[in-house]
């Protein structure tokens, strides 16, 4: 009887460890995705501001902010054509 209890305890401990590892893996994936989404939102917000400024009649394009956005896009690995200005 003692050996069966020990085996059950070891099995339960192993299952708990596996459960914790799976949760940590899922948390890591979630945090990476959240960081990526935040970067995308920042880039889209900058593009929106550029378009609003461009629509103003007294906008003089010095291309500085556009260049900064393009560098930000490429530095974060976005190769999506929708981000092209």
Swiss-Prot record:
Residues 29-85 are cytoplasmic. GO terms for biological process: receptor catabolic process; symbiont-mediated suppression of host innate immune response; symbiont-mediated suppression of host type I interferon-mediated signaling pathway; symbiont-mediated-mediated suppression of host tetherin activity; viral release from host cell. GO terms for molecular function: CD4 receptor binding; monoatomic cation channel activity. It is found in: Host membrane. Signal peptide: none annotated. Keywords: AIDS, Apoptosis, Host membrane, Host-virus interaction, Inhibition of host innate immune response by virus, Inhibition of host tetherin by virus, Ion channel, Ion transport, Membrane, Phosphoprotein, Transmembrane, Transmembrane helix, Transport, Viral immunoevasion. HIV-1 lineages are divided in three main groups, M (for Major), O (for Outlier), and N (for New, or Non-M, Non-O). The vast majority of strains found worldwide belong to the group M. Group O seems to be endemic to and largely confined to Cameroon and neighboring countries in West Central Africa, where these viruses represent a small minority of HIV-1 strains. The group N is represented by a limited number of isolates from Cameroonian persons. The group M is further subdivided in 9 clades or subtypes (A to D, F to H, J and K). It is a single-pass type I membrane protein. It comes from the Viruses. Residues 1-7 are extracellular. This is Protein Vpu. Enhances virion budding by targeting host CD4 and Tetherin/BST2 to proteasome degradation. Degradation of CD4 prevents any unwanted premature interactions between viral Env and its host receptor CD4 in the endoplasmic reticulum. Degradation of antiretroviral protein Tetherin/BST2 is important for virion budding, as BST2 tethers new viral particles to the host cell membrane. Mechanistically, Vpu bridges either CD4 or BST2 to BTRC, a substrate recognition subunit of the Skp1/Cullin/F-box protein E3 ubiquitin ligase, induces their ubiquitination and subsequent proteasomal degradation. One of its GO terms (cellular component) is membrane. The keyword Transmembrane helix applies. The chain crosses the membrane at residues 8-28. Ion channel activity is inhibited by hexamethylene amiloride in vitro. The keyword Transport applies. The N-terminus and transmembrane domains are required for self-oligomerization and proper virion budding, whereas the cytoplasmic domain is required for CD4 degradation. The cytoplasmic domain is composed of 2 amphipathic alpha helix that form a U-shape. Phosphorylated by host CK2. This phosphorylation is necessary for interaction with human BTRC and degradation of CD4. Homopentamer. Interacts with host CD4 and BRTC; these interactions induce proteasomal degradation of CD4. Interacts with host BST2; this interaction leads to the degradation of host BST2. Interacts with host FBXW11. Interacts with host AP1M1; this interaction plays a role in the mistrafficking and subsequent degradation of host BST2. Interacts with host RANBP2; this interaction allows Vpu to down-regulate host BLM sumoylation. InterPro entries: Vpu. Belongs to the HIV-1 VPU protein family.
């Amino acid at each position: 009887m003692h050996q069966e209890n020990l085996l059950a305890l070891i099995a339960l401990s192993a299952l708990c460890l596996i459960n914790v590892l799976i949760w940590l893996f899922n948390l890591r994936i979630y945090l990476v995705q959240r960081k990526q989404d935040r970067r995308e939102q920042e880039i889209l917000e900058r593009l929106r501001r550029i378009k609003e400024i461009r629509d103003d009649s007294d906008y003089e394009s010095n291309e500085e902010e556009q260049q900064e956005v393009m560098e930000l896009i490429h530095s974060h690995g976005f190769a999506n054509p929708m981000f092209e200005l």
